[in-house]
């Protein structure tokens, strides 16, 4: 696209990978960056557990029936380019041979002990418009501005990852200044 681009960043346990993503965004003309802090671990998606959803799919009687009833989808799955995490495939084999779910990748590779100094480091390394996504309180909103964020995004990751948290709408009246 020729329009302005925003990159949504997650901090990885491998800080070199995080740095590499930021540098590549600069190189390829991204205009702003957003650090996501509201989903550092994969959510417990109960519906996916009930339905047996997984990536890659497990072959069960139900899934084989679904494959048979959806031949176009099945052929696309079998013959299309295999899934890979394009942003990290060049730096780690964890982004290539995805025989694990994306959820497992998140849980193994994303930094779960992120803190304010990590966020501030990313703001400074980026050096441009920077949003913090996942702000849940007035204190966090103020701290985000203090470390140099130019925007905040009030989020509970669409409720898909954090379905037990407060909704952004419920937080809005407290945070709006």
Where would I find each of the regions flagged by the language model?
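Active-site entrance/lid segments in N-terminal catalytic domains of soluble metabolic enzymes
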Residues: 1-146, 150-151, 158-161, 170
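Shared catalytic-loop signature of beta/alpha-barrel
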Residues: 164
């Amino acid at each position: 696209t020729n329009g302005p681009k925003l990159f949504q960043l997650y901090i990885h346990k491998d800080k070199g990978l995080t740095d590499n993503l930021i540098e590549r965004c600069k190189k390829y003309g991204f205009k702003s960056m957003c650090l996501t802090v509201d989903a550092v671990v994969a959510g417990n998606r109960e519906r996916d557990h009930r339905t047996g959803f997984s990536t890659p799919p497990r072959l069960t009687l139900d899934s084989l029936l679904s494959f048979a009833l959806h031949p176009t989808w099945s052929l696309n799955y079998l013959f299309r380019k295999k899934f890979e995490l394009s942003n990290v495939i060049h730096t780690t084999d964890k982004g290539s041979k995805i025989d694990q779910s994306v959820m497992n990748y998140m849980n193994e590779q994303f930094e779960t002990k992120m803190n304010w100094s990590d966020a501030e480091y990313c703001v400074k390394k980026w050096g441009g418009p920077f949003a913090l996504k996942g702000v849940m309180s007035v204190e966090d909103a103020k701290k985000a501005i203090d470390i140099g964020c130019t925007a905040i995004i009030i989020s509970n990751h669409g409720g898909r990852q954090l379905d037990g948290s407060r909704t952004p709408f419920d937080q809005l009246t407290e945070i709006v200044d």
